Each structure stands twice: as structure tokens, then as C-alpha cells.
Regions:
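Short, small-residue-biased leader/transition segments that mark boundaries at the very start
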Residues: 1-9
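An exposed, glycine/acidic-rich loop-and-rim segment of catalytic or binding clefts
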Residues: 8-191
Length: 191
């Protein structure tokens, strides 16, 4: 479980996240293509030419970003979709359908071969999904000299809406003096 609390002194913009990598198939078990992902997200952020959110949201229906029903992560890797082609995998902010700020289960990641499963609980409005698209064998090695490789793990980074300060209607990330920032994300593991 990750719980974060902080208080602002001057007015601050706050949207903290984690950057944990998961491959439930196991260490050095190959790419995450066959892991099964489910997210209660109905939209993703649209991005400008500099890959910054442009204030618009894209409905996931009929796109490789629709994980409302569980499916293999790798199913979308070769999709004919502009952002998928540019990133070579997922590196997108997914917006949860329920924006109440309540803490509950928002998704899961599963390796059906081993039976390992991760359930994602959070009170955050979004999750950035990153599938290690930019990782390559020239990066520093993992433990025991094992080489890194593209799609070797997936990140589920709960967060506020990125660049929200510049887009009315996005998550409020302004923290004023005396206000408290308090958020909780839990990764529950099962086997």
C-alpha cells in the first residue's frame, strides 16, 4: 500500500505517483504481452505534438485502449492507432469512469499461466499505463546481469489528470497553504 500525505507551504501543484514495474509471469520471464489487464477506465487523454495532454479526452470504445473487459496487454501493440504506433506500446493516462475520489478496486493485472494476480485499489482519478516501450538491452542490466528488454514489465501509475493546471475541468491539483494532500493506492497480490 502506498499512502501519501503532505501539506503545502506556498501554493503548490501536487500530483504524486509511483513508478513500480510488474511482470507477474516472473523475473526474466519474457515480455508482458500475455498478461491480462482490466481497468475501469472509459477514456484516455488526447495528446498534442509534444505528447502533452491537449485538454481533450478520447473514448476508449473500439480502440486498443479499451480494457474495461479483461484482455491481454499485447493485443494492442501492433494496432493501427496513432499513439500506439508512436509509442510502440502503452504510455497513456487512462481516466477512471468513477471520478468520485472514493477508494475502491479499479482494475487488475493477471498472469493466467502462474495464477499470479494484482488488484489495483486507489482513490486517484487516473492511472498511467506504461509497458516499458523505451527499455532496451543497452540499458543497465537487472540483477545477476540479466539484460533489460522492451515490454519486460508494466507500470500502473495512479495519479491526478496530467497537466490539469492548464485545463479547466481536469482534476484540481492546486494545494494551498494549510490544505492537506492525502491519497492511497494499494496493489494487492494473489497466487
Amino acid at each position: 500500500m502506498t499512502g501519501v500525505q503532505t501539506c503545502a507551504l506556498p501554493i503548490s501543484i501536487v500530483s504524486l505517483t509511483n513508478h513500480s514495474y510488474f511482470n507477474l509471469a516472473g523475473y526474466n520471464a519474457g515480455p508482458v504481452d500475455d498478461l491480462v489487464l482490466q481497468l475501469d477506465c472509459d477514456k484516455i487523454n488526447s495528446l498534442d505534438n509534444e505528447l502533452i495532454p491537449d485538454g481533450k479526452l478520447i473514448d476508449v470504445e473500439g480502440t486498443p485502449y479499451d480494457f474495461r473487459k479483461a484482455k491481454k496487454v499485447g493485443e494492442g501493440f501492433g494496432a493501427d492507432f496513432p499513439m500506439m504506433k508512436e509509442f510502440g506500446g502503452y504510455d497513456n493516462n487512462f481516466v477512471f469512469a468513477d471520478q468520485s475520489g472514493k477508494y475502491f478496486k479499479r482494475g487488475s493485472l493477471e498472469d493466467t499461466k502462474s495464477g499470479r494476480k494484482l488488484d489495483l485499489y486507489t482513490d486517484q482519478p487516473c492511472v498511467q499505463v506504461y509497458t516499458g516501450n523505451m527499455i532496451n538491452v543497452n540499458d543497465p542490466a537487472f540483477k545477476n546481469g540479466v539484460k533489460q528488454y522492451t515490454h519486460c514489465a508494466v507500470c500502473l501509475e495512479t495519479q491526478a489528470m496530467p497537466d490539469s493546471i492548464n485545463h479547466p475541468g481536469f482534476t484540481n491539483t492546486v494545494l494551498k497553504p494549510g490544505e492537506k494532500y492525502d491519497t492511497t493506492t494499494t496493489f494487492a497480490f494473489f497466487n
